[in-house]
Amino acid sequence: GAWPTQELSPQVIVNCADTASGCHGGDMLSAYRMMKEMGVPEEGCMRYTATDNECTDFNICRDCGHDTPCHAVQNFTKYYVEEYGYVTGEEKMMKEIYARGPITCAIAVPDDFLAYKEGVYRDKTGVTTLEHAISVVGWGETEDGEKYWIGRNSWGNYWGENGWFRIVVGKNDLGITGSCNWGVPIIDFSCVCYLSNRRTQMSSLCCLL
């Protein structure tokens, strides 16, 4: 299969969204507000470093040559959202993903989720403190008929299923249906997203994660 190829820079959001509090959590809506007012470049402009940096030209888009020091890039493409909002509940989440693209949701993070490797995750802790943001891009169903959300995390490709995860639908595990946000991109991209050998419903805008 093929995963989305158009990826924006989460590090710029960490650096520049005023009330997102960078790596210390915060308000997801402020990230969408920043994307509407300021725009976000492609990930190649500023790779994810999991650190809080000042919102300067150097920390928005930079270029590093083999024989020259890193320097800020002045001319680069930014991507914007035209509107954004709040959504909760499984049915409304699915309608939003189907109609307009991936959504961002806050979740709890118990130890066994940190150690997640593969398969459909089921929470056994009952923890409900929302402290981490992930993207929900679609949903699917196992051969045994178990429904699950398809989520993308920000902990690198070595975590989970190549940086992605599946979590059971219908139980609100990790509080995944309780606090989600959506954003509508201004530019309409076209991309193909699918998971081989699985029944899935994926958004055509998954490339904007």
Predicted regions located by residue number:
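Catalytic-core signature of thiol
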Residues: 1-209
